[in-house]
Amino acid sequence: MKLPYFWEERSPQIANHVFYVPNYYSRYEEFVMPTWQELFANNGPICCELCSGNGDWVVEQALKDASVNWIAVEKRFDRVRKIWSKMGNYRVNNLLIVCGEAQTFFSHYVSDASFQKIVVNFPDPWPKFRHRKHRLFQDLFVQDMMRTLVVGGQLTLATDDYNYLVNAITVMLKYLSPGLKSPHYINVKDNYGGSWFENLWRSKGQEIFCTEFIKRVGI
């Protein structure tokens, strides 16, 4: 698997179940995004995972129920290649990979009320204060995720970083309804679903936290 373009010739394109969304590009709107029905060849519900890593978690979810379509968003091409390999090895047909930044994909190519569920698994916490502007859970992007959820849709975050968790909950409380009682998170012991990052942090003895928020009527 290779990138379908040289850097100087980069442009959004879809090939072999991968949607390539290049960085530092100014003509996103020129690409005509196919409908979800055209991409998945069905009208089934769609769920989206952000920060998919090597794809262990999302491939497992896609295999559990073939009637549910999944989108895996991962910005690193080396990881996208691993997800793509797993798709082929397990013959997964209900998964689309997005190779690019989540914010760019959502703002330019995801229409309102597209997703039943959005799951953000172990995002980079950007712990240094001067780097916090790079965090996913900021007002503008949380509003964009809310926009793309159906009414009753769910936004889930799993992380090993407690401070990141608390900050993300603070932002989500502005726009969504908590699905868990205060303090709005749980400590995940098991049964979350395997992923490379989850296994890594558990092997280091770190706790795994999970929070869930719901889009209510009128939001």
UniProtKB/Swiss-Prot annotation:
GO terms for cellular component: tRNA methyltransferase complex. S-adenosyl-L-methionine binds at residues 49, 74, 101, 124. It is an enzyme of class 2 (transferase). Its EC number is 2.1.1.33. GO terms for molecular function: tRNA (guanine(46)-N7)-methyltransferase activity. The active site is at residue 124. Substrate binds at residues 128, 160. Pathway: tRNA modification; N(7)-methylguanine-tRNA biosynthesis. It comes from the Bacteria. It catalyses: guanosine(46) in tRNA + S-adenosyl-L-methionine = N(7)-methylguanosine(46) in tRNA + S-adenosyl-L-homocysteine. Keywords: Methyltransferase, S-adenosyl-L-methionine, Transferase, tRNA processing. Catalyzes the formation of N(7)-methylguanine at position 46 (m7G46) in tRNA. Belongs to the class I-like SAM-binding methyltransferase superfamily. TrmB family. This is tRNA (guanine-N(7)-)-methyltransferase.
